[in-house]
């Protein structure tokens, strides 16, 4: 995931295990429990089908239980892209700016079922990875000769009930410049999809979408249905903290 070694990061299942331990301990002692999760991520399913969000919802519905999570500081990070493909469009281009050479980064593209998409990638020098045909569980790697950047593309169907599509794009030895991802509709109803880059702390350089969208930037698990999500504010003037949420 190219997360810098100096940044603390935890697996989702480890957080779930910690919540389970606290819930069990509170039940044994017959005590109320407030779970504060001062962590967040741009990764994973943003819907109600995400594993951590689902588990927190289950725990929070129990008597004497409450879960609180931060909404994150991604509002102005330009790490979210909202796509919309019209019926007459062959594809939509998504431009990603990499401001300096970096070890790598990744992008998660999510689409709600029954939407299905395929992608191609163009490098800053114009070299093209042709459209990778959609195949669930399929993976393809390509090395751009001039940039020496390795790009891998994974197609997955996720979730226990919904079967939403996830396209995972991984850029290793990412070269500076504008990278273009072309999104091709395979089966669409609304034509809507979302892309997310990692959180600021999870990248070792500045990378962002040129046509970013400021909505849907609350970090997981702050988007869970039964979790109280908290944002920041400016203590000097009482206004909202611009990066919050």
Predicted stretch roles:
Residues 1-245:
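Loop-rich non-cytosolic ectodomains and luminal regions
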């Amino acid at each position: 995931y190219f997360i810098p070694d100096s940044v603390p990061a935890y697996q989702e299942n480890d957080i779930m295990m910690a919540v389970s331990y606290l819930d069990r301990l509170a039940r044994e002692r017959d005590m109320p429990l407030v779970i504060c999760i001062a962590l967040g991520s741009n990764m994973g399913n943003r819907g109600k089908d995400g594993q951590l969000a689902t588990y927190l919802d289950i725990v929070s519905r129990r008597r004497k239980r409450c879960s609180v999570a931060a909404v994150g500081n991604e509002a102005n990070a330009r790490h979210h892209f909202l796509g919309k493909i019209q019926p007459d469009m062959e594809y939509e281009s998504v431009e990603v700016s990499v401001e300096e050479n970096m070890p790598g980064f990744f992008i998660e593209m999510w689409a709600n079922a029954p939407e299905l998409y395929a992608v191609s990638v163009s490098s800053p020098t114009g070299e093209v990875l042709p459209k990778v045909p959609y195949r669930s569980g399929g993976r393809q790697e390509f090395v751009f000769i001039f940039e020496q950047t390795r790009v891998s593309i994974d197609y997955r169907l996720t979730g226990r009930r919904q079967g939403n599509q996830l396209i995972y794009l991984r850029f290793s030895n990412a070269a500076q410049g504008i990278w273009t991802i072309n999104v091709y509709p395979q089966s669409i109803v609304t034509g809507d999809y979302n892309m997310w880059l990692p959180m600021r702390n999870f990248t070792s350089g500045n990378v962002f979408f040129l046509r970013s969208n400021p909505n849907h930037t609350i970090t997981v698990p702050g988007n869970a249905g039964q979790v109280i999500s908290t944002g920041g504010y400016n203590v000097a003037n009482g206004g909202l903290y611009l990066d919050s949420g």
